[in-house]
Amino acid sequence: MQNKTDKLGFWSIVLLAINSIIGSGIFLTPGSVVAMAGTKAPLVYLIAAIFAAMLALTFAAAAKYVTKSGAAYSYAKAAYGENMGFYMGVVRFFSASVAWGVMGVGVIKSTLSIFGADSTSFKNITWGFVVLMAIILLINFFGQRFLTWVSNLATIGKLLALGLIIVAGVIVFLKTGVNHFHDLDTLKAANGQPLIPKLTTSGLVMAVIAAFYAFTGFESVASGSEDMKDPQKNLPRAIPLAIMVIALVYIGTILVAMAINPAAIVKTKQVVAITAIFQARWLRILIELGALISMFGINVAASFHTPRVLEAMAKEHQAPQWLAKRTRHDFPVYPFMITLALAIFIPMAFQYNMTAIIVLSAMVRFFEFIVIPLGVIRFYRGANVEPVLTAERNWLTDVLLPVLSVAFTIFLLFKFDWVGEFGISTAQGIVPNWFAIIGMAIGFVILPAGLFMMLRHEKS
């Protein structure tokens, strides 16, 4: 039995949420958002933050009705019944497992590049991948208290690194007195055309989606709610607070980058793109180390969330019962090992080609962002299929915000570049991206159908 003192308190939940959300995105990919949106990039991040905050408050509202581990799985099961819960649990577990693998590959490739090794070598990536996962296994094996300590340390490290970018940028700006924010308007490509295209509605939507990916992760925080103190009280307060802190840090980082050297962040080929805005080598090294800490931290967070989805399904008798057993250190070892196997072997089977896996993970999130808000409305109306906790009902968080979240999600899906994501441009035209198509089929159809038949056979 786990002591309550070993469980995550309010501030540890806040730090876990920050650790789950801030990963490699803000360090590696702000250039793509700036390249799409130009001087409107801070506005894009603000819109993405508002959307993330709406969804975070909606998921937090679900957490006050359902405090079982499993997050989206448990919410869907309570709102719609066993079948929807099972489907949500399987696709969420699969995509989260493989997404963890993607994040692991990101850490290894970045580490290899920073230290001058070949980051494209299959052998180098594989060995680095195995070592990283072994370290994370040891961290989890030592129990909840040690994992919490590592997670909190990683969170503080990444916030310090981002804080360093902002402080150093402000100092550079004050020393030079020059604001390069509008230099983007005059940048030219090699063909003489403007480097930043004119912003259209479709372009704005794709930029918001790209920026929004930097905020994803909040939906997984409640996966381990049974390992938290008073989750029904702490989760609805901790998740929105984490989103607010992250939004301020992200927008501050982008504003600093665009004021100092926006051209560098768009044109750079460096692994940690945000370092391109600075000239000082020592400063770049510090930021690169912060990026590695950030990416390692989000891997630790993923190792906490993801296995608990499968464990939660076992506790609800929708997966084999041996998956619900824990070690004497209160570690769900069997779900963890299955998660670890998926995280290692799926990316390896795709030769570390991440395109299909990233698309799969994104599509499952969009699926969640429609199903769960509608489920919260069912909780509010008392239309849930399974019993939920008696919670204080709030029309703003339980009805209005879920409706707005669903509407915005559908709008993003409508404007989503489906051809670009599921097609590959060649000299002969656009051909199907079979990696992406097969990945979607496995995650949404083959795996759920296979596990459903296995479960029915076991029960019979």
Cite the ranges covered by each PLM segment.
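Membrane-interface "cap" regions at the ends of multi-pass membrane proteins
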Residues: 1-31, 35-40, 53, 57, ...
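Helix-loop-helix junctions that connect adjacent transmembrane segments
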Residues: 3-6, 41-42, 118-124, 156-284
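C-terminal membrane-solvent junction of multi-pass transporters and transport-like membrane proteins
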Residues: 322-331, 369-437
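Membrane-interface loop-to-helix entry segments
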Residues: 111, 124-182, 239-244, 361-372, ...
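Transmembrane helix-loop boundary segments of multi-pass membrane transporters
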Residues: 31-37, 41-42, 114-125, 145-155, ...
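Hydrophobic transmembrane alpha-helices that form the core helical bundles
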Residues: 32-35, 44, 54-133, 137-141, ...
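TM-loop-TM module centered on a large, flexible mid-protein loop between adjacent transmembrane helices
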Residues: 74-75, 81, 113-118, 185-195, ...
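Helix-loop-helix connectors at the membrane interface of multi-pass transporters/channels
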Residues: 1-2, 77, 104-127, 161-164, ...
